[in-house]
């Protein structure tokens, strides 16, 4: 139409009137030397206060999650935070004091992206989390370029195989090889950043992948195919919460007695594990 056109995110448009009204120097006074202004994050997941938060660039992840977000509810432990939307990376506890700016976030394997910030506690399986995001990325692939179309599909197949208890020793190397190929040859940002959830979880939580593959065990007890659904009588507090929460009536329990799971009735919904206050079910 022979008219100038501006294409940007809504967040960028929202900042423009304030910059015009108050001046560039006012805006540049907020943030860091290389990342100016504020950033809006959608804070969600295993955190007490969820919602949209606007913070100055340079604030740390710890301040956002624990000071603004109120920390992890139900006395669970912080495990990781996923930044940047589906193609972002997972950052572990060791990097909670990372400043929120473009350069620092990139150094720990994540991206600012769309401003998504998903907090995860110790009951989150990082392999299953990578599978979840890869499922989304594969579904969103337009199919134009082969690396993204076929590569993400193959990565998803491997992750599904691992979480279902059929992982093989070479799967980790293959995931890394596919990730490198997709990042370097995909045509657009989706494919180039798509492997991030897998690469970051492999970097920081490689032991979970190895437990799934070599021990056929899910440390977080979220992959039903790798859970035995057995009650540890020595750890069980005999509270009966698991029995009351079981939708299939598969858990036998009497007062002052440890619970017992009838495996023929168990539908592996994980409700007992989610609700057990003593983590007595494995």
Language model regions located:
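Secondary-structure transition/capping motifs at alpha-helix termini
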Residues: 71-76, 140, 165-169, 275
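C-terminal accessory/binding modules appended to enzymatic or scaffolding proteins
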Residues: 37-49, 55, 219-271
């Amino acid at each position: 139409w022979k008219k100038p056109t501006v294409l940007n995110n809504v967040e960028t448009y929202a900042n423009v009137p304030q910059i015009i009204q108050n001046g560039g120097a006012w805006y540049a006074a907020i943030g860091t030397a290389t990342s100016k202004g504020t950033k809006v994050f959608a804070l969600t997941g295993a955190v007490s206060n969820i919602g949209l938060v606007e913070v100055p660039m340079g604030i740390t992840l710890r301040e956002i999650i624990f000071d603004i977000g109120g920390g992890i509810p139900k006395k669970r432990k912080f495990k990781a935070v996923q930044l940047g939307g589906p193609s972002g990376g997972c950052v572990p506890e060791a990097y909670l004091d990372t400043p929120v700016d473009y350069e620092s976030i990139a150094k720990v394997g994540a991206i600012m992206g769309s401003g998504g910030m998903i907090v995860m506690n110790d009951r989150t399986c990082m392999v299953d989390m990578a599978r979840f995001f890869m499922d989304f990325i594969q579904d969103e692939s337009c199919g134009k370029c082969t690396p993204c179309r076929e590569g993400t599909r193959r990565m998803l197949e491997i992750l599904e195989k691992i979480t279902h208890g059929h992982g093989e020793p070479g799967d980790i190397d293959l995931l890394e090889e596919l990730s490198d190929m997709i990042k370097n040859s995909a045509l657009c940002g989706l494919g180039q950043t798509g492997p991030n959830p897998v690469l970051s979880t492999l970097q920081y939580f490689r032991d979970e992948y190895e437990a799934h593959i070599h021990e056929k065990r899910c440390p977080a007890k979220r992959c039903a195919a790798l859970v035995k659904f057995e009650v540890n009588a020595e750890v069980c507090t005999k509270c009966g919460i698991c029995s009351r929460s079981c939708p299939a009536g598969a858990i036998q329990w009497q007062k002052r007695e440890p619970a017992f799971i009838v495996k023929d009735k168990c539908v592996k919904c994980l409700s007992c594990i989610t609700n057990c206050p003593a983590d007595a079910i494995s």
